[in-house]
Amino acid sequence: MKTFLALVVFALQAVAVTPVFALEEARLHISGGGSPNELIFRSGQHEGYYKQEGIELLPIVAGMLPGIQALIAGAMDFSQIGGQGAGAILRGAPLKIVMIFDTRPANWLVCCKSIQKLEDLKGKKQVGVSSFGAALDQMTREILPKHGLDPQRDVVLRSITRSSDRLPALLTGSVDAAVLSATDTIKAKEQGCHVLLFYGDELEFISGGVVVNNETLTKRQDFVRRFLRATLKSFRWFKTNEKGATALMRQYGKLSAADAATVHKMVIPIYSRDGTIPRNFQERMIALQTANLKIDKKIIPEMVYDFSIVDSLNRESGK
C-alpha cells in the first residue's frame, strides 16, 4: 500500500512540474457563410494542422472593410480577403498578400424572376455587391461595360458587406440582382433564381488567400511561417480530399451532399497550383485594380505581394 501511495504521489508531482505549452492564438478575419475559401481554414482546424504548428486558430466573421481595418490596426493577425486587402495596399495600407487561393473569381451574378437577361438590369436596377472598392465591386465595374452596361449610370451598385446577407437581399427583393458565392448560387437557383453570368469566365481576379500586417510579417516571422505551413497543408487537403471538403460544406454551408459535391467541382479549377501566382499575373492584377480604384501612381508587385515564405514551404515539402 505504501509503495502504491508513493507511486501516486510521484505521478502527481510529475504532472505538477510538466510544463503546459499554451497554443499561440491566430485571429483570422473570414467572410463567413461557409464559402470554399473560408473552409480551407476550417479544414486545417478539423485536421489539426494549426495545432501541429502550435497555433489556436480563431476565425472571426466580419465585413470585408471592417475586417481589413482591424488587420491594419493589429486587432486581427490575418485576413482571408485578398481583394479588399489588395485595394487597401494600393491605397497605402501597411499590408502584404502572402498566399493566394483563387486565380479566377468563383462568383455568379444572379437574379430572380423579374430579370431575364443582363440587359434587363439597365434602368437603375439595384445590384448587390460587397464593400465599395472590394473585390466584387471592382470585378463588377470591370465586367458590366463588356456587356454594354455602365456601372455608374445604368445600374445602382449597392454595398452589402457580409456575403451571407446578399442572398436574403435578393430573395426578399431588396436588390434586383446580386453577386453570390458558389454555395449561395445553388441555394438561389433552388428558389427559382437564375444566373446571368459567371465571373470566372470574364476575368482573372484574386479574392481569397492570406493577408498580413507588415509589422507582423517582419517581427513575428516564425509565427507567420507556422500559420502559412498549416494553411498550405489545409489548401492541399481541401483541393484533393473531395469527401472531407464536401462534409465541411454540408456542415458550414448547409448544403446537401449532391450540392456540396457540385460546389467542390465548381471551385477546384480556379485555385492556384501552389498558393502563389507568377509575376506577370501580379502585374496584371495591379494594373486592373489601380485602374478600377483610380490610383495614379507607380506600384510594383513587391509592394503588394510577398510569397517568399510560401515558396520556401513548397521547397521544404517538395511540392
Could you describe each region identified by the protein language model?
Residues 6-16:
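Bacterial N-terminal signal peptides
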